[in-house]
Amino acid sequence: VYKDKLPNTTITKNYNYYIKQGNVTSKSVAIIFKVKNENNLNNFLDNINKLDIKINFFIDASWLSDNIEKAFEMTNMGYDIYNLGYDGKYDKKSINKSNNLIESITLKDSKYCLNEDKNDYEKEVCKKKKMLTILPTMVNPSILELRQNLVKGAIISYDLDTFDNSKINIILKTITSRGYMVKALNDVINEKRY
């Protein structure tokens, strides 16, 4: 009988690096949507609520503070919500406030920052709060880019403000037709061997 063993230096306790990809031993990917306002959100939630997939939302704290009930609704639907900072930026002054807001809704620790432009200052802010910094494998990929660059453990980010809701089914078919499953960010980053 073999026991599962994590690496000596586990990524979940090391905040110095960007996480560009999840576990490559599992054919799973994570899809992230950035939420900055409600323009596209209600239609999108109606659309994906009919599907059996796990979507991850990084929510702007400015929008969140005015839409706490909507965030509770998203959490109750089974979606994970995370801190996008203020206007997509993390700074020393406001990260505590936005983390407290997220944690009061999810009843979980805020543990991820989203950093699409590899901003080292923001990574350091997140590191001091013991938050892992996600640098997605793909940002707003077209269907062709998704087909060409899909790999085990991919973390795919879309901006919900500019996202075409009619494309979600094509995106999911592209992913699942290649044998991948869409999972929660926590599950994709998990270092356990599958």
Task: Give the location of each predicted region.
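Catalytic grooves of carbohydrate-active enzymes
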Residues: 39-41, 146-188
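Short loop or secondary-structure boundary microenvironments that flank
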Residues: 35, 61, 161-162
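Short amphipathic alpha-helical surface micro-motifs
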Residues: 12-15, 96-97, 164
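N-terminal pre-catalytic segment of deacetylase/amide-hydrolase enzymes
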Residues: 1-32, 37-46, 180-194
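Metal-dependent polysaccharide deacetylase catalytic core of the NodB/CE4 family, i.e.
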Residues: 27, 38-39, 45, 49-156
